[in-house]
Amino acid sequence: GNIWVIIPDQGIFRYKDNELYFYEISNRRQFKQESPNCICVRENGEVWIGFWGLGICRYNPQNDSFEQIVEDRDGRPLVGKNINSICEYGDWLIMAANEGELIKYNTKSHVLEDIKVAGADNTFYTTVAYMKGKIWLGTFNGLYVIDEKKNEVVSLKEDLMRSFSLSDKMIYSMCQDSEGGIWIGTLFGGVNYLPNRNLQFDKFVPGSSGNSLNTKRIRELAEDVKGNIWIGTEDAGISV
């Protein structure tokens, strides 16, 4: 299979069979305004890239290139949006933009629609995932769990008076494990774990134990085939 790597100031890389392939989507001089920023590999194998400033791109394996989508079928633009995160949602792709926009794009009908998030106005959207039949949105003002079918939004925030609340309001990453638990990475509060039974978080932060985290600044979370959770940090490497 392919290993995909996004380096915002350089471009998109694909590694396969000891060969490294490079895809330069935008002008190098514009990398600060037009840069690849996130990736979604759908269940059918399609690879989609979300950009700052350039909309979204889909990988075409037939000619080994990316096809840019700058607007929907009605002319609503994607160009100019800063897309921080992208995930699969049935026939849709959900995108979290740092302007405080949560939008979805239908890959079949090519329609773009807004997803309203009550209480999440005027905040920075960092990451989005579709887990347990709901949309999970990480922001710089907590976590929002959205049920579109029921038109319901649950807001989860840091609360110093509640020991089982989030440890930090700034959410950077999310991951669902094979047991249905959800891991939340924060900017200043380490890792939060939400078991598959309630909305009370367990917390993992730096401590005196040799098996504890080395930092509270969490960037990425992922589970491997053995069930191990890999934790990428901002300033202390990787923990497992």
Segments from the language model and where they lie:
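Carboxylate-rich, polar loop motifs that coordinate divalent cations or form catalytic acidic clusters
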Residues: 1-240
